[in-house]
Structures are given as C-alpha cells and as structure tokens.
C-alpha cells in the first residue's frame, strides 16, 4: 500500500476531525515510524499539529542511541519531541502504565487532545488471544478500541485495520528482545500463534472476526438498553439475573478505566442486592454509592475521602472512609475484622482529633494529647488517627486505644457492634 492510501483511510474515518493537536507515541519500531512518516507528511491535509513522545525503557544497550536518533529525526522534521526514561523494576504492566502516564503529562503540557498509537491488526489478534487465555470477561474480547475516550482525551489507533505486512520497509529500530519468550505477548507472537495457524491458516482472521462480532453485540445491547435506567435498582431487578448482569456490564462500559475483574464485578452485584445504604471504593479511584433504590459509580470526591472533617454513620448502614469499611450492626466476614461494642440507639461519628479530646480509661478522663505522648505515638499518626464517637464520648481511637467502660455499664449501653475492615484504596 502507498502512503496516500493510508491518508485516504484516515480522512474517510475522520480520526482527527475534532482535534487540532495530536501526540504520537513514537517507539521507533516499524509501525510507529511509518505512522510518523504518514502523519508528518500529511499534517496539512489532516489539519493537525503533530507532537512526538518517546519513552526510553532503558532495557537494551541500544536504547540510548535510539533516543538520540529520534531526537535527530524530530529536529529534521521540525517537530517537538518529549522523552522520558523508565526507572525501577521492569514489567510489561509497569512499563505500560508509565508510558500512558507520561503521554497524558505531555498532552496536558501541550494542550493536545488526541493520543495516536501505531497498534495494528496483528497487535489486535495477540491482545484478544492473551485475554482469552487469561479468562477475561466476554466484552473485553472485542480487543483494542479503534477510538477510545478516556477523561478529556481521545486515544486513536488509525492502523488497527492494517497488518504489519501492509507497511513498507522504512528506517526503524528492531527490538531484539521481541524474539525472546520471556514475556507473555512474545510467547503468543512467536510460539502460540504459529502453532494455531498450522491448524487453521486463517486463524488470525477468525480471531479478528470474533472480536468484531463481540463488539457488534456490545454496541447493539447498549443501543437497545439506552432507555433503561440501570441506576434505578427497582427497574434493574425487574429483569432476569442474566439480563441484570448484561445490563450492569453495559453500564460499566461508561467507565473505560475501571476494568473490574470477575470477582470485583460479583462484589458490586452483591452490594447492589444489599438493603442498606452503602458507599464503597471499588478500583482506580472510583466508588460505588448506593442509597435505597438508586446507585451510581463515580470518581471519589475529596469531600468523601481524606478531606472530610466528620462522617456520620447510622445504625444498619455501612460506609467506606479513609481506607476502612465501617459496618454499624451489620456483621462483616473475615479474619482481620475489628469489633467495637457500641449502642444502636444513636448514630456514630467518625472524625480526626480535636483540641480538648478526652478518653475514659480506668474510670479516669485522659486527654488525647497526653495519651499520645505516653504511648509515644508519632505526630503523623496522631493527625491521621480516626476517632469513633458516640453520645458525645470517644468510644475508640482506631488501632490505638478504646474506652474501657465497666462491664456492667458496657452491657447496659453497648447493645450492638461496629465492625471495621481495612480495605485497599
């Protein structure tokens, strides 16, 4: 194929119609170098300002030399280039996260709204097969998205309909580590795919066909369920269990960076079936909020997180707060659940310390400031310590000390339990 053929495809698809500035992820491999050539040659026709971004993973001797060559290439093309060096223990996942964090920084700095990557059809086949082997959810078997909006940016993969063999042989850097089978993707590319193609020479086309079919089903379900308010639990639960699962999965497609595992999805389902109000951190900065017959998934707000001064928890309710799950009168299962005797007669307040706070110990009121000094509690831990209060008295300083009322008084007043579980944030 000739370069104008790729240009015509880009124009027909309208990839850059909404964008004035685009960042190209430039690895130096054949696919990204050819994409660089097409985009830099036809900037005017595509009406974009091109910005280059490269990550030096520091995993090969040649990587520093390649970085210098890419700087020269950018200078010759009179294009800006941003480069970052990966450090720390290397893994595919850590490197990928590092790259995308860096690309977003570049976009924020330059005002670009599109990130362009050179993923092609061969990458798509490998990705779908990897996910299938790992046992991912069906909707993820549609593979890499051609266009994907994440927050305020759009990721564009204009080569996704082309195979690597469609690209002309031009100057590029060959990563010799791609021939090693140390990483899963390399084993897919070098070992598994060739063996499967012996059974079916059109295996790659078959995998791509399955991915496209799953994508069609996803889009059709989204369109057909457009008038269903999934966040209304009364409406959601009016359908069969199977339909509920599909509707909930379709709803989760609204949050492309959430990516719940099967176990996490099952946990969300269980929470939605609970009768109590609920606030639960899920993953990647999202939380699930359930209030009676309504729920929503949203980014954790500062008010609901570390900056909240005081939280009020009512009987038969649960709430996630600053890395803990508090359950008032509703038992939690697990080996590391803390239990604090409390009363069901009034709400519980969870907060940080205040000037003048006291705790009753051995029948005596002791100021928290003196207690912290006696226990040699570091200042940082003093400031972050969570205070559990009821009836205007401190019941517990989480993980540090508890109000030790007499047994008779405790039995008379404390007629239920506050369950506390440490959770990941």
Swiss-Prot record:
Domain statement: The N-terminal region contains the highly conserved SGGXDS motif, predicted to be a P-loop motif involved in ATP binding.
Keyword Secreted in record: no
GO (cellular component) term, any one: cytoplasm
NCBIfam families: lysidine_TilS_C, lysidine_TilS_N
Broad class of enzyme this protein falls into: ligase
Source superkingdom: Bacteria
GO biological process: tRNA modification
Keyword terms of this UniProt record: ATP-binding, Cytoplasm, Ligase, Nucleotide-binding, tRNA processing
Family, similarity comment: Belongs to the tRNA(Ile)-lysidine synthase family.
Location relative to the cell: Cytoplasm
Catalytic reactions on record: cytidine(34) in tRNA(Ile2) + L-lysine + ATP = lysidine(34) in tRNA(Ile2) + AMP + diphosphate + H(+)
CDD domains attached to this UniProt entry: TilS_N (cd01992)
Organism ancestry: Bacteria, Bacillati, Bacillota, Bacilli, Lactobacillales
PANTHER family for the chain: TRNA(ILE)-LYSIDINE SYNTHASE-RELATED
Gene3D superfamilies: HUPs
Annotated GO MF terms: ATP binding; tRNA(Ile)-lysidine synthase activity
InterPro entries listed in its UniProt record: Lysidine-tRNA-synth_C (IPR012796), Rossmann-like_a/b/a_fold (IPR014729), TilS/TtcA_N (IPR011063), tRNA_Ile_lys_synt (IPR012094), tRNA_Ile_lys_synt_N (IPR012795)
Binding site for ATP: 27-32
EC number: 6.3.4.19
SUPFAM superfamilies cross-referenced by the UniProt entry: Adenine nucleotide alpha hydrolases-like, PheT/TilS domain
Function: Ligates lysine onto the cytidine present at position 34 of the AUA codon-specific tRNA(Ile) that contains the anticodon CAU, in an ATP-dependent manner. Cytidine is converted to lysidine, thus changing the amino acid specificity of the tRNA from methionine to isoleucine.
Name of the featured protein: tRNA(Ile)-lysidine synthase
Record bears the keyword Cytoplasm: yes
Transmembrane residue ranges: none
């Amino acid at each position: 194929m000739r370069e104008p053929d790729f240009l015509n495809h880009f124009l027909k698809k309208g990839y850059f119609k909404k964008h004035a500035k685009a960042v190209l992820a430039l690895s130096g491999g054949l696919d990204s170098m050819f994409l660089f050539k097409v985009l830099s040659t036809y900037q005017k026709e595509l009406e974009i300002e091109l910005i280059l971004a490269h990550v030096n993973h520091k995993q090969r001797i040649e990587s520093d030399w390649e970085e210098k060559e890419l700087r020269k290439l950018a200078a010759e093309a009179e294009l800006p280039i941003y480069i970052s060096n990966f450090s720390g223990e290397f893994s595919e996942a850590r490197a990928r996260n590092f790259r995308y964090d860096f690309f977003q920084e570049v976009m924020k700095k330059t005002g670009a709204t599109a990130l362009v990557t050179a993923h092609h059809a061969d990458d798509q086949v490998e990705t779908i097969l990897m996910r299938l082997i790992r046992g991912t959810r069906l909707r993820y078997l549609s593979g890499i998205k051609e266009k994907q909006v994440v927050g305020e940016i759009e990721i564009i993969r204009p080569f996704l309909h082309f195979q690597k063999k469609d690209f002309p042989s031009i100057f590029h850097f060959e990563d010799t580590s791609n021939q090693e089978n140390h990483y899963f993707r390399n084993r897919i590319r070098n070992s598994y795919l060739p063996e499967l193609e012996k059974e079916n020479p059109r295996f790659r086309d078959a995998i791509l066909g399955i991915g496209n079919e799953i994508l069609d089903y996803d889009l059709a379900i989204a369109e057909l369920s457009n008038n269903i308010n999934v966040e209304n639990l009364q409406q959601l639960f009016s359908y069969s269990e199977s339909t509920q699962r599909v509707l909930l999965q379709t709803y989760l497609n609204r949050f492309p960076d959430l990516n719940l595992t099967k176990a996490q999805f099952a946990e969300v389902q269980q929470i939605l079936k609970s009768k109590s109000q609920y606030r639960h951190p899920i993953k990647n900065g999202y939380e699930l909020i359930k209030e009676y017959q309504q729920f929503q998934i949203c980014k954790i707000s500062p008010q609901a997180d570390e900056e909240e001064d005081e939280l009020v928890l009512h009987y038969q309710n649960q709430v996630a707060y600053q890395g803990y799950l508090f359950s008032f009168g509703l038992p939690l299962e697990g080996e590391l659940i803390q239990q604090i005797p409390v009363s069901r007669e009034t709400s519980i307040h969870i907060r940080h310390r205040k000037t003048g706070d006291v705790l009753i110990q051995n029948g005596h009121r002791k100021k928290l400031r003196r207690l912290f000094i006696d226990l040699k509690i570091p200042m940082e831990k003093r400031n972050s310590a969570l205070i559990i209060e009821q009836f205007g008295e401190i019941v517990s300083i989480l993980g540090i000390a508890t109000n030790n009322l007499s047994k008779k008084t405790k039995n008379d007043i404390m007629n239920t339990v506050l369950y506390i579980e440490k959770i990941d944030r």
